[in-house]
Amino acid sequence: MALLISLPGGTPAMAQILLLLSSACLHAGNSERSNRKNGFGVNQPESCSGVQGGSIDIPFSFYFPWKLAKDPQMSIAWRWKDFHGEFIYNSSLPFIHEHFKGRLILNWTQGQTSGVLRILNLKESDQTRYFGRVFLQTTEGIQFWQSIPGTQLNVTNATCTPTTLPSTTAATSAHTQNDITEVKSANIGGLDLQTTVGLATAAAVFLVGVLGLIVFLWWKRRRQGQKTKAEIPAREPLETSEKHESVGHEGQCMDPKENPKDNNIVYASISLSSPTSPGTAPNLPVHGNPQEETVYSIVKAK
């Protein structure tokens, strides 16, 4: 294919430059069509950005025209800095570059054609270009290829803040401080109210419990007192009756004085004893003697 360019009054040097540019464009287009026709490649974003100390995900996907073997043994590798740079990760070994120890995670499963490379705890030195590379076993043998442009990673400083006017910043800070103070005051007031209500409730419950205990003890003591008073009168008649029966028994057992008849005078002795009727209360001696005797005499005339 030839391209004819004619420039009126132009120089041969200018014509040669235009021819070179045209041939380069045609070559690039043919190369792209050839890759699409062959059907293999790695897709990655052109660039991505992250914050220092944070994390970043670099997504990737790949495609190919070959038929996979029974055991394709797929593996993913990554390079950095340039197309032929050092390997920083290899899933088949596995291998992680010393610079990325504990900071690389490959979210990819065997057999899948897409995944994500995650870089943790970003550093300023991580800012460079990254290239994904694919290995797999096909019916035609081992095939491998990688991304040509790669992905440019940009790392920004976490301390970077947008510039603002001092007056605006001061006013905003003062307003924010006032809002925070008001919120804290509101929270403290609400907390005091809740505490007061809780203490009042606890005090009321405590007083009710104490009053209930006092009433219970008073009722129990009163009940015991009534029971004691009821038992004492029941015991006193029984003890008095037993005492009187003892006294009466002694009176009945006492033999009257037998005075012999002397000069036609008959002496008789009467002693007090318990009554014949058990229902009648006995009469206690008036004096301190346990038993009183009365002597009567009768004179008989002949």
Swiss-Prot record:
Keywords: Glycoprotein, Membrane, Phosphoprotein, Receptor, Signal, Transmembrane, Transmembrane helix. One of its GO terms (cellular component) is cell periphery. It is found in: Membrane. InterPro entries: Ig-like_dom_sf, Ig-like_fold, Immunoregulatory_rcpt-like. Phosphorylated on tyrosine residues. It is a single-pass type I membrane protein. Residues 228-248 have a biased composition (Basic and acidic residues). Residues 220-302 are cytoplasmic. Residues 1-31 form the signal peptide. Residues 270-280 have a biased composition (Polar residues). Residues 32-198 are extracellular. Paired receptors consist of highly related activating and inhibitory receptors and are widely involved in the regulation of the immune system. Receptor for CD99 and PIANP. Contains 2 copies of a cytoplasmic motif that is referred to as the immunoreceptor tyrosine-based inhibitor motif (ITIM). This motif is involved in modulation of cellular responses. The phosphorylated ITIM motif can bind the SH2 domain of several SH2-containing phosphatases. PTPN6 seems to bind predominantly to the first ITIM motif. This is Paired immunoglobulin-like type 2 receptor alpha. It comes from Mus musculus. The gene is Pilra.
